[in-house]
Amino acid sequence: MTFSFHHHLRDGDYVVNLVMAAAIEELGLKDLTIAATSLGSAHDPIADYIEQGKVVGIQTSGIRGRMGEVVSAGKLKTPAVIRSHGGRPRAIEAGEVHIDIAFVAAPTSDCVGNCRGVGGKSDCGSLGYAMTDTKYADHVVVVTDCLVDFPNFPAS
């Protein structure tokens, strides 16, 4: 199963950690692939899941921190796939990457999932880079700490 994430919140993004902890520790999922735009030191806890063999694949444009060290040490079950920022959406559109669930961290969202990169406590700008994931994923989950009235407008 492949989960996608975006790094709009940079090193303040703990959505990857929360989702993976719930999927692995609470739901007992395994053989997971992370398709993230980029992974940094905020995502160091994921290194444990790689070492345990729960996360078996990574597709991203960058891996830093402890997770990068674990992957460089050969502990990931399958080779990590590193693509440019433009190569990632192209691979998704071409069907080279299948996303089961796209998780989009957003500063604001309304009750039907219209999300924006502004207006909340953690503005990050345009969420346009997440559009390919949300278009091609089997399921989309918007994660926010600021629920706003419908419609969340204008789009960003």
Model-predicted regions and their roles:
Residues M1-S156:
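Conserved alpha/beta enzyme-core scaffold
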